Swiss-Prot record:
PROSITE patterns: ETF_ALPHA. FAD binds at residues 223, 248, 263-266, 281-286, 300, 318-319. This is Electron transfer flavoprotein subunit alpha, mitochondrial. GO terms for molecular function: electron transfer activity; flavin adenine dinucleotide binding. Belongs to the ETF alpha-subunit/FixB family. The modification N6-succinyllysine is found at K59, K69, K85, K158, K187, K203, K216, K226, K232, K301. InterPro entries: DHS-like_NAD/FAD-binding_dom, ETF_a/b_N, ETF_a/FixB, ETF_alpha_N, ETF_asu_C, ETF_asu_C_CS, Rossmann-like_a/b/a_fold. PANTHER family: ELECTRON TRANSFER FLAVOPROTEIN ALPHA, ELECTRON TRANSFER FLAVOPROTEIN SUBUNIT ALPHA, MITOCHONDRIAL. The gene is ETFA. The lineage of its organism: Eukaryota, Metazoa, Chordata, Craniata, Vertebrata. Residues 1-19 form a transit peptide. It comes from Bos taurus. It is found in: Mitochondrion matrix.
Amino acid sequence: MFRAAAPGQLRRATSLLRFQSTLVIAEHANDTLAPITLNTITAAKHLGGEVSCLVAGTKCDKVAQDLCKVAGVAKVLVAQHDAYKGLLPEELTPLILATQKQFNHTHICAGASAFGKNLLPRIAAKLDVAPISDIIAIKSPDTFVRTIYAGNAICTVKCDEKVKVFSVRGTSFEAAAASGGSASSEKASSTSPVGISEWLDQKLTKSDRPELTGAKVVVSGGRGLKSGENFKLLYDLADQLHAAVGASRAAVDAGFVTNDLQVGQTGKIVAPELYIAVGISGAIQHLAGMKDSKTIVAINKDPEAPIFQVADYGIVADLFKVVPEMTELLKKK
């Protein structure tokens, strides 16, 4: 049975939306914006009201300019200081609190990446509110949806905090359009460096393959590959597909690959156009990290493997025969 809202209720709802304002904490590498920030902006737009982005860094003018062009962003706040090098949460927290004091946002959010998960709990603690982590949908300005029990159950959370602080699962929201916007840009509130931690260095592994969480195609291997050397089969296949390579926790724990390739509840969450699971049985923890993929292909010699329950296409066969055959066929195209 449906019940029509009274005119007064509609006016109050419209008024509430009008006064919503969301601050998105931008994740970036000074010259490039992290893709998850665009997904977070889309989530923020679902709340209604004005969306502002805070960019903190050392030489982040380009990122600020790029954000001004993003559809749906009304304002970009820029803070540049040597203290913000490396985006240390200890230094960013006072900046965000000062920004919140100035603009009185109703919502503060960031992507549910290592950056966001490290920063937002500090913000929430300082504001004395309970944060909401890893949301996958927004029902209203105070009602959010997230998964629990390794993705096997969905929880709807109603938040009555004065400021809603939450992190966004990037794979659950489309990326905001990188063009079409015309946001204004201004300097953010200045704060003194805290100085309790210092950014020293960062060493990035260079790879011709796309980054795992942003790749359109992912080829992942599990314990069925039997050794780290056999992961070369996946690397060869991935090269033909221009894909990223991932792994199950079992493969990581066995020492086959490093943990930066781990896909799953305790690893990285991915949702590519195509996910190929090779020699992966399909533990709940792994499924939680890839079940939102658009198309899932599973290769496993065990027909009872749980991975086939979520796969769109399944190949029950020896991976050591199938994967090289797939690679050779792709080479001939």
